[in-house]
């Protein structure tokens, strides 16, 4: 590969500049701006009839040969595709069933196209299979290799005939076999047969491997020249067409093919090409890492759940929650509108004042800190907490310095790598401006003791409400406890008083008994002779 090709690939994969990344201390997140949108707004259908020719009536009976081997490959591939076509009809019935929507995702191996796109494509394929539709398409191609055909439901499709293999078989191979049988000494004929047969065999293999629905558009399904003609015929502006022509690889990745069926010696399939009808509107990307605040061994942790791509479209903001919904080429972001969610423009407040905004910024909560690295376009967010060692490094000198506990933002201008224990993360070398927006970490607003357990994808204001309710419950519990303690104290005092009174009563009783026992006894006057005349000694 020449240095010019390498340089071209690097330029295509790297934004041309103008990116600006903001690190938000308040929420441990980054917002990267400066991207331009390329949004899919529709699909363009191209129907192909790949003509094989009359191979069924060609036979080789004069022993092994290259021609015989290639001919058997062609016949076997045609039979295999008939089986795939029959299985395809059964699978499409499942895809179109509302109860079997989950089968849609299984219909495409890589999930490049959305489920809705596959379902819509299958609906068109079912229409093309209706009696008369294939005949009408082939009729439109009788005198030309390319024509626009209108289906019975009013859908206009581009029809393309691929006759190279058929023409070779009918005009060169068949006469040669009839004359010399299959033992043709001309090696050039055998090589030519293999070359013309290659596209057909590869188309069969791709539909067979992917059960009738391919996850992308290969050069065999659609040559580059055919793709250029199809894109040029799309009902959109010249600027959008030029952008798609400049990014043909992305058009292929975002498209898919569906097998229509085998009709005699004709293989009919359709290719769905994305129409990127919205271009050059602003897009930005949000990344985040867990933000935790600790107290006495307990933690309150928050993680922004509104991460993903955002693009402006027709005055509204479209949010793409899954990173695979969008792909970056240079400074353009290719996204599928079917995967987007319209959000209010106030959602931008989550990037400015997440603690005070009334917009329901989505977060997840937890009481257990998680250490991780979130790579951003111009750097990395590092969440480093207890039990984990974190550091940044250089490809030339190794470790530069360790990182402290908490959330840190590492610019790709300051380091090449980030390490958490053993895993090493390589930072991108995309150029752009970077700056930090200071702010108090939102997690520090919460007492870890009162912080709720794990909650996923809830509004931040609900977290505040939940904590406030927890505080109120704790306050009420304390009041009840205080009143209970006071009541218990009063009850104890009454019991003590009663016991004291009883003890006092017992003491008084004992006092009088003792006093009575100590008092002198009162006997009658002593009788003697002096005072008792009747006394007889």
Curated annotation (Swiss-Prot):
The chain crosses the membrane at residues 494-514. Pfam families: Fusion_gly. InterPro entries: Fusion_F0_Paramyxovir. Residues 515-537 are cytoplasmic. Residues 103-124, 103-127 are annotated as: Fusion peptide. Keywords: Cleavage on pair of basic residues, Coiled coil, Disulfide bond, Fusion of virus membrane with host cell membrane, Fusion of virus membrane with host membrane, Glycoprotein, Host cell membrane, Host Golgi apparatus, Host membrane, Lipoprotein, Membrane, Palmitate, Signal, Transmembrane, Transmembrane helix, Viral envelope protein, Viral penetration into host cytoplasm, Virion, Virus entry into host cell. Disulfide bonds join 28-407, 60-182, 283-311, 292-301, 326-335, 350-361, 384-390. Residues 1-18 form the signal peptide. Glycans are attached at residues 57, 353. Residues 125-153, 459-484 form a coiled coil. Belongs to the paramyxoviruses fusion glycoprotein family. This is Fusion glycoprotein F0. It comes from Avian metapneumovirus (isolate Canada goose/Minnesota/15a/2001). The lineage of its organism: Viruses, Riboviria, Orthornavirae, Negarnaviricota, Haploviricotina. The gene is F.
